[in-house]
């Protein structure tokens, strides 16, 4: 299937892999595909997302923030406070004893074998679905090549909950889809 991907669409998937690794994610999720798209897409496609308030820097910052807060978030801190445990004090004590990075999520352990040698990070089921939907979008439009905009349509068609939140919810997604489709129509 990847032989049908344009150079930009391939670069977006490659960039998704790179971003997932940099953000210390053990998997490539839909959010990483969106981030990869925003990193390499044509200016017109990036502009469509930027007008909706979705930029590469914003998505990356939100993913980094989510990753940093993932082990124990604010709700967990409140629950622990209710039983007399100050999570901030525990964190400070651990960082004082073991260093500032003591609570950082470690870089995922590389797999062994052939996949490890090529630096493979697996796609989540949702991210795989987005890749497959990009092919379906291409076929439905009778286009020959899967481009970044097809990948964007697939993200908009099947966002996971995190991606939907980043994109601004269902209404924002509904407004983005025709704008991305219009880009493809102009290119055809």
Predicted features, each with a name:
Residues 1-188:
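Histone-fold recognition with a strong bias for associated Lys/Arg-rich disordered tails
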